[in-house]
Amino acid sequence: MGSLRVSTFAVAVVVCLSILLMSPTDGRRVCDSAAGLCSMLFSCNTQCNSLGRNFTGGECSDARFPGLSVCYCCHNVESSAEMESM
């Protein structure tokens, strides 16, 4: 009975790993386009979405001056494997 449990567990692990390896992976998210100053994440997302350039939101990051934050708009970058297939 113990060997049946071990083999069932091994099959489950193989199936899970196969699904994970075969599922498409999205590109990574890069936030590198400055879009002005922001005070909170909500305002930064609004700024980036209003630009309408396929941005997926934005992030407020601290500037070098105290009390100031810079809004960086984010976009998805495709993985290198997807770029090579194009």
Swiss-Prot record:
Top-rank lineage group of the source organism: Eukaryota
Location in the cell: Secreted
Family classification: Belongs to the DEFL family.
GO cellular component term, pick one: extracellular region
UniProt entry keywords in alphabetical sequence: Antimicrobial, Disulfide bond, Fungicide, Plant defense, Secreted, Signal
Gene this protein is translated from: LCR85
UniProt keyword annotation of Secreted present: yes
GO BP terms in the entry: defense response to fungus; killing of cells of another organism
Disulfide cross-links: C31-C74, C38-C60, C44-C71, C48-C73
Protein name as it appears in the record: Defensin-like protein 97
UniProt keyword Secreted, yes or no: yes
Residues making up the signal peptide according to the UniProt record: 1-27
